[in-house]
């Protein structure tokens, strides 16, 4: 049986971590043990924040829809309820896009919602 030395695999593993640590400050970019800690923490942050990003965007969309709805005398909750009554099936992302970039279309939508709410109450 031939003797197996692990220098090649160790070097490859260290190189992989140090490549991931490019751009870090101080010894975190050049010292394997410190780089390993920093890279592991960075990956934890990345995992967590991929989930938080979804929450943050939904929150941003709701804020934008609420601001646009209030310009037309409606609150966010009443606006969304009115959309459901009117049978409008648009998600928050599209509604926020309309509120920011297509104000005329959003105004028509708000008028539709207002008429449905008045008709229903």
From Swiss-Prot:
Keywords: Ribonucleoprotein, Ribosomal protein, RNA-binding, rRNA-binding. GO terms for molecular function: rRNA binding; structural constituent of ribosome. Gene3D superfamilies: 6.10.160.10, Ribosomal protein L20. One of its GO terms (cellular component) is ribonucleoprotein complex. It holds the Pfam family Ribosomal_L20. The keyword rRNA-binding applies. One of its GO terms (biological process) is translation. It comes from the Bacteria. The keyword Nucleotidyltransferase does not apply. InterPro entries: Ribosomal_bL20, RIBOSOMAL_L20_CS, Ribosomal_protein_bL20_C. Belongs to the bacterial ribosomal protein bL20 family. PANTHER family: 39S RIBOSOMAL PROTEIN L20. Binds directly to 23S ribosomal RNA and is necessary for the in vitro assembly process of the 50S ribosomal subunit. It is not involved in the protein synthesizing functions of that subunit. This is Large ribosomal subunit protein bL20. The lineage of its organism: Bacteria, Pseudomonadati, Pseudomonadota, Alphaproteobacteria, Rickettsiales. The gene is rplT.
